[in-house]
Amino acid sequence: MNLSQYLTPLEDEMRAVVAPLAESSPALLYGMLRYHLGWADEAFHPVQVYAGKRLRPCFLLLACEAQGGPWREALPAAAAIELLHNFTLIHDDIEDHDARRRGRPTLWTLWGVPQAINAGDALFALAYRAMLRLDAGPLPPDRILLALRRYSKAILYITEGQCFDLAFEAQEEVAETPYLQMIERKTAVLLGLACELGGLLAGAA
C-alpha cells in the first residue's frame, strides 16, 4: 500500500477546481485560498509548503480501489473532501482564536476575521464545485446523486460537532456521552465519509 501515489493527482485535481478562479477578481479572495492551501506566501507569490497529510482524500481513493473501482474516477470527490476539511479549519481557527496553522499565520490573523470567514465560505462552495466534477466522468448519475446526499449529511454533522465543541469551552466538566457525540461528528465524520464515498463511487452497496 502506497498512499503517495494519490498525492500528485489529488493536488492536480484541487488546483483544477481553484486555480482557474485565481486569476479573476477579487484577487485577495483567491490569494487567501491559495495561501491557506499551501500554494502561495503572504504576498501571494507561488510556493509549495506543507499543507497537511491529506489523509481523508487518500482514504477515499484507497477505499475506492479496495472495492475494485478506478480510483482516478473518484478524484473529484477526494478533492472535495480535502477542500471541505480546509474550510472547517479556516472557521475553526477563527472560533478557537488559533494564530498559527501548519507553521504559518492563520488567515484571520493576516487579513482579519471578516475576510477569513468569507474565504472559508468560498472554500465551502468550491468543495461542492469539486464534487460536481464527478458528473464529467463515467459514473452513473444516480451514484453521484447518492454521493452528494451523503456528503451534505456529513456537513451537517460537522456543524453539530463544532456546536458541541464550542459549548464545551464554557463548561468546567463535560460528560462522556456529549463528548463522544462531539468527536463522532467533528473528528470521525469526515474520515468515515471519505471511506464511505470511496466505496460508494466504486459501486459498493
Role assignments for model-derived ranges:
Residues 48, 101-123, 172-187:
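Divalent-cation-assisted or electrostatically stabilized phosphate/pyrophosphate-binding catalytic cores
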Residues 66-70, 130-148, 165-182, 196-205:
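Inter-helical turn/loop segments and adjacent helix faces that build the functional surface
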Residues 74-98, 149, 155-157, 188-192, ...:
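Active-site alpha-helical segments that house and flank conserved acidic catalytic motifs
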Residues 114, 118, 154, 158-162:
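Mid-bilayer segments of alpha-helical transmembrane spans in multi-pass integral membrane proteins
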Residues 110-111, 117, 121-139, 149:
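A glycine/threonine-rich phosphate-anchoring loop and its flanking beta-alpha core
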Residues 1-4, 152, 184:
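Short amphipathic alpha-helical segments with heptad-repeat character
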